[in-house]
Structures are given as structure tokens and as C-alpha cells.
Amino acid sequence: METVNVNLGKRSYPIYAGPGILQDLGELLGGLPVGRKVLLISNPTVFSLYGEKAAESLARAGFTVAVAEIGDGEEHKTLATAGRLYDRAFEAGLDRRSSIVALGGGVVGDVAGFVAATYMRGISFVQVPTTLLAQVDSSVGGKVAVNHPRGKNIIGAFYQPRLVLADVDTLKTLPVRQMRSGLAEVIKYGVIWSREFFAWLEQNIEALLNGEAGALAYAVRESCRIKAQVVEQDETEQGLRAVLNYGHTVGHAVEALTHYRVYTHGEAVGIGMAVEAGLAVALGMLKRSEGGRIIRLIRQAGLPEGLPEGLPPEKTVEKFYHDKKAVEGQLTFVLPERIGRAVVKNGLAKNFLLEFLSAGYGLLERGAGRV
């Protein structure tokens, strides 16, 4: 078991990563000054696979465990779902010293974290992510939220977990599509932060797709290490942390315009990273050769790289204005300057973006990856 620490003063916490560590959940939580009541939140699929092991580990450590299940998918990430979880927390007798444990992917973690942040003004929260995307991204950094009909993650908070436990053995049961989806966020870290990690991914993408435990453990640990470094410097996204949104301005627009029914989050981010790499090339910020490497790796991961056919540029750009990063009508994109470094770009003109998208995003050839 490897440990990555997120150093945030009184809100610091460890990320434990490795194979076969779910059985240690109770012992690790028991080492913290928390009460003995726990609400374990999961979805039916994950709970059927790992719920009993997690609950038994908590019970062995002296915790009284109540269970709540929520549906899987973005359509369940709502205030209505949160309301049902508040009811379950009251029924289970949770008080201000109790804990909520999220066992599942990003939706479970986001909703459970939002409930933990707001129940009795905040109780202890533990992330036990079981998808690659959640292990490398959504479980780390304290972003918790539910969706609103007008936008994704509009209702939320920054609320750090007490610990994160990422057992890479849970990835063995992950469908191939979800594994590829998680790789989008892994690739993101290489593009925005570490040229060396990006090069490692180019050499090891097949091993990751084949589920090789050693490669997965390294990718999870390195991704968490990079995200921890960013979060430590900018916990509440006032500046630097915005680079973690590379691929997400376009990605969120794609998700919304396809009603969250066509693409997984990671697939949408893959499209976003490809389009935004093309945008960086069109602006003269990124070398065409570097853009080509980014597109090739996205394709090798089995992720989509082009906007959906028939998606009107006008509607796409309009969705950009609903993005949380847009401030006072100014659009904000995170664009790579080179592999290993990304910057925040503000104030791109609407007409330029319309031209860019209408032309098949400029210097980026749709579906070809030649930039």
C-alpha cells in the first residue's frame, strides 16, 4: 500500500493506493477521532461486488454501519437524491461525530460528499473510489456537488475527505468502456503537469488497457500525486487549480448537449482535450507536433476525439457560457502550451470560436488526429 499525502493544514488527509486494501478500511477510519456510526453509500452494482467486504471491515473495527444505495449515472446526481440520503442519515441516528463513506464511482462520491458537507453543517467523509476515473480524479481534492437542470455540478462545495482509499483490485470488475473513460483523466495529468508521465503513458497505454496491476497502481499513484500538488497550492480554484479543467469546458458542453446519455464523463473529456488541443494549435500556443502526440494518445486509449456529428457550433458555444469557469460573460479555457504545461486562457471571442468549430476546429483534422 502506497500513501500520497494531501497537505492542507488542518484539512490534510492521506490517499492510500494499492491492491487488496479495501479490507483495511475499518482499521484506517478507526485510527481517526470519529464516532462509531457510519452511513455507507453505494450503488447496487458496486455494493453487490464490494459492499459486504467494506461493511465487514468497518464492523470489525467497531463501527455500526447503515447502508444507502443510490442509482448510477448523472441523472441520479440531484437534490432529490441528496434529500433521500438525509432521511437515511436521520433514520440511522448519525450525529456530528458520525461518518459517511462513499463506495463507488464519481456519482456516488459527489453526492455522498455533498450530503456529508451539508448534513449537520458537515460530518466526516471518506472516499472509497471503485472506478479508475474516481480513483485518479473525483475522489481527490474535495469537490462535491449535485447537478441542476441548468448545469452540471452547479450546487456544491469544497469539502475535503478524511481519507481516500483506492483499491486497484476493484478495477478488475470495471467494464472496458469505464476503464477507457478513466484514462482520459490520467492523460490529462500528463498534458497539464508532467511531460515524463505523459511519455510513460505513451509507452504503457496497452498495459493499462489490459488491466496490469503494476501499471494501474503506478498510474493511480502518480495521478493522485499530481492532483495533490495542484490542490495544495490552490484548494478552492482561485487560480492554478483551474488547469485541472483541461478538456472540461468542451467536455461539459458535449455532455449537456447530448443530455448525459451518449458519452461517459471521461469520453466527453477526451473529446474536450482533443478539441482544446486543436484550439491551442489554432491560437499558435501549441506546436502541431505536440498536439499530434496528445491526439494520438487519446485515440490509443480508445476515446472519441471529435465532436458529435450534427452538433451546431452555435449551441456548443452557447453552452460554454454556462460553464462555471465563465466569469462576467468571459469564456475561460485551459489550453496546453506544451506537453507538461497548461495555462488558463480568458476572453476568447465568440466569433473566433464559431469559426473554429465550423471549420472542423481549425488545424485539427476531425478523426485523423493530424495537427
From Swiss-Prot:
Its cofactor is Co(2+); Zn(2+); NAD(+). NAD(+) binds at residues 72-77, 106-110, 130-131, 143, 152, 170-173. It catalyses: 7-phospho-2-dehydro-3-deoxy-D-arabino-heptonate = 3-dehydroquinate + phosphate. Zn(2+) binds at E185, H248, H265. It is an enzyme of class 4 (lyase). GO terms for molecular function: 3-dehydroquinate synthase activity; metal ion binding; nucleotide binding. Pfam families: DHQ_synthase, DHQS_C. It comes from the Bacteria. Keywords: Amino-acid biosynthesis, Aromatic amino acid biosynthesis, Cobalt, Cytoplasm, Lyase, Metal-binding, NAD, Nucleotide-binding, Zinc. It is found in: Cytoplasm. Its EC number is 4.2.3.4. One of its GO terms (cellular component) is cytoplasm. Catalyzes the conversion of 3-deoxy-D-arabino-heptulosonate 7-phosphate (DAHP) to dehydroquinate (DHQ). This is 3-dehydroquinate synthase. It comes from Pelotomaculum thermopropionicum (strain DSM 13744 / JCM 10971 / SI).
